[in-house]
């Protein structure tokens, strides 16, 4: 269900933008999925296609990019990637982080100093990175 809510927000963003720009059709949408969120791309794509049906975005190409999750310790300055520590998470923890990414601080610590005081530098959210539209008179 979470993926459908994300897809709905993406679709609304795309259609609002297209309307503001006077588009006759949406040709493509580029969406960035943060690795930390662990979003099921296939479900988001299916949901977007269903919601685009009957709109100027029907048939638009949907392109996904995954943004690697990177963290930086506020205590010692060490930077690390999620893939370096992801094997420590069981399925329950992955699901908790999927719904509320901020809880990662409860389950993860800096691999260098052990501090839980770190920031998510990148790879946390989901966002629309690009929308390609066609206006009247354009081919």
Curated annotation (Swiss-Prot):
The keyword Manganese does not apply. The keyword Zinc applies. Ni(2+) binds at residue 2. Zn(2+) binds at residues 73, 76, 110, 113. One of its GO terms (biological process) is protein maturation. It comes from the Archaea. InterPro entries: Hydgase_Ni_incorp_HypA/HybF_CS, HypA/HybF. Pfam families: HypA (PF01155). Gene3D superfamilies: 3.30.2320.80. GO terms for molecular function: nickel cation binding; zinc ion binding. Signal peptide: none annotated. Keywords: Metal-binding, Nickel, Zinc. Belongs to the HypA/HybF family. NCBIfam families: PRK03824.1 (NF003008). Involved in the maturation of [NiFe] hydrogenases. Required for nickel insertion into the metal center of the hydrogenase. This is Hydrogenase maturation factor HypA. It comes from Thermococcus gammatolerans (strain DSM 15229 / JCM 11827 / EJ3). The gene is hypA.
């Amino acid at each position: 269900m979470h993926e459908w809510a994300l897809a709905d927000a993406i679709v609304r963003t795309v259609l609002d933008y297209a309307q503001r720009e006077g588009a006759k059709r949406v040709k493509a949408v580029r969406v960035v999925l943060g690795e930390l969120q662990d979003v099921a791309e296939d479900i988001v794509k299916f949901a977007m296609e269903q919601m685009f049906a009957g709109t100027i975005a029907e048939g638009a190409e949907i392109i996904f990019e995954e943004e690697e999750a990177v963290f930086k310790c506020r205590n010692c300055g060490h930077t690390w990637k999620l893939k370096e520590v992801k094997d420590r998470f069981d399925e329950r923890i992955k699901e908790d982080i999927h719904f509320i990414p901020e809880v990662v601080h409860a389950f993860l610590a800096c691999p260098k100093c052990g501090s839980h005081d770190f920031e998510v530098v990148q790879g946390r959210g989901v966002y629309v990175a690009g929308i390609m539209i066609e206006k009247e008179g354009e081919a």
